[in-house]
């Protein structure tokens, strides 16, 4: 009877651990999906602004201000998706993010500051100012991508 009880208890513990591990894997998958969705949404609006800056779309200050506000808002979202363990899985994030977390956070903050500048420039209606601000935002994106994204 003791052997059956021990075996049953051991089996229960294994099943519980398997369930916990599965829940942790789901949490990691959700974190990766969260940050990918935020980056995809941000890229959609950034690309429209870049097309405008590069002369492929006419400059519409009202539309660009709307797009810039969207990017500014969304630029705050992806960072909570970089949870421990999410370096594994379907991701282009380099492991360095978790080893150089302070630098990664500085780059995230820099991006957020630059997106605010783009919003301000777009709302001003000044194309020259808008182009300069978008250029600085692109530089912030590229700096972080070079350091922390697998291509």
Question: What kind of region is each of these model predictions?
Answer:
Residues 16-20:
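N-terminal signal peptide c-region/cleavage motif recognized by signal peptidases
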Residues 25, 29-61, 67-151:
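Sequence context surrounding c-type heme c attachment/ligation sites in exported
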Residues 13-15, 125:
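Short intrinsically disordered, low-complexity segments
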Residues 1-9:
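Bacterial N-terminal signal peptides that target proteins for export
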Residues 9-11, 21:
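Cleavable N-terminal signal peptides
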Residues 2-3, 22-24:
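Long, acidic, intrinsically disordered low-complexity segments
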């Amino acid at each position: 009877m003791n052997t059956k009880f021990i075996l049953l208890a051991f089996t229960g513990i294994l099943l519980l651990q398997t369930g916990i591990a599965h829940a942790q894997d789901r949490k990691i998958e959700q974190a990766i999906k969260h940050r990918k969705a935020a980056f995809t949404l941000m890229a959609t609006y950034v690309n429209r602004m870049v097309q405008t800056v590069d002369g492929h779309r006419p400059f519409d200050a009202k539309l660009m201000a709307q797009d810039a506000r969207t990017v500014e808002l969304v630029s705050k979202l992806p960072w909570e998706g970089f949870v421990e363990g999410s370096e594994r899985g379907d991701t282009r994030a380099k492991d360095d993010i978790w080893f150089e977390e302070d630098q990664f956070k500085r780059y995230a903050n820099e991006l957020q500051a630059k997106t605010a500048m783009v919003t301000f420039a777009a709302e001003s209606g000044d194309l020259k100012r808008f182009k300069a601000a978008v250029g600085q935002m692109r530089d912030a994106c590229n700096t972080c991508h070079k350091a922390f994204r697998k291509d």
